[in-house]
Amino acid sequence: ADGDELIELAPPGDESLADLANLMNRRHRWRRSRGAVLFDRPEGRFRLRDGELEVHVTEPSPARQLVSEAMLLMGSVVAGFGQEHQLALPFRSQPMASLPTTEELERIPEGPAQDAAIKRCLSRGVQGTCPMPHFSLGLPSYVQATSPIRRYADLVTHRQILAQLAGTEVLPEERLGELIDDLDDPLRQSVQIAREDQRHWQQVWLARHRDQSWSVIFLRWLRPQDSLALVHVSDLAMDLVGVAQGADPTPGQTLSMTVAHVDSDRGELQLQFA
């Protein structure tokens, strides 16, 4: 909140953060002009704090955009450094996607449903030793480099750059490629575990509030033959997957939803639309 105030008010003698935010906004617009796919909406996550389950909603803000854009800028600069010095790095890329046309998007109400229509067209990111464009970031090349404590690949990037600057031996491309291959499965598993963790706590939360009626936005059918639906719960700022009954909605339609059945131990969730 303090950062947002400094950016928005730019008090005399303390304009540096606002100036930096303006620079990052220009960078943000530049990426958008290059086709970056941007989703600036609240995001909810469940957290256990002192044994209590609570919803934490992260709202978009000037300070968060500044930090996010600065992190992407660093990743772009590091990628450029690697290319300039022919340095093997764990580049992240994303294949080009064919997005819905303007006419197709106009048939879907603006908001989470439009976002879902775009997201389903995007391919999974790829990590490799060769610099390639990252479609949704709107960048010609990119390397994650801001979290060497949290991500091993970021640590490898830092060690490669430090070795290059010091004139000492760097990892050759072949060895780095082997490291990336070794990391691929554990990274996929960690992402899947994180998703399953959130899905579990969603179901625990809904079990505790199963008498409540929720206003949801229908996003799409994941498996129409099984009535498996994807909906957005605005009060929780998160998407929800469950077997749905009671209506045949279209993307973007707002519905009233109740929980017909939930078993968090079995991972079962049935929704009733009205």
Language model regions located:
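Short beta-strand-to-coil "C-cap" segments at the C-terminal boundary of structured domains/repeats
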Residues: 272-274
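Electropositive polyanion-binding surfaces
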Residues: 1-255, 260-270
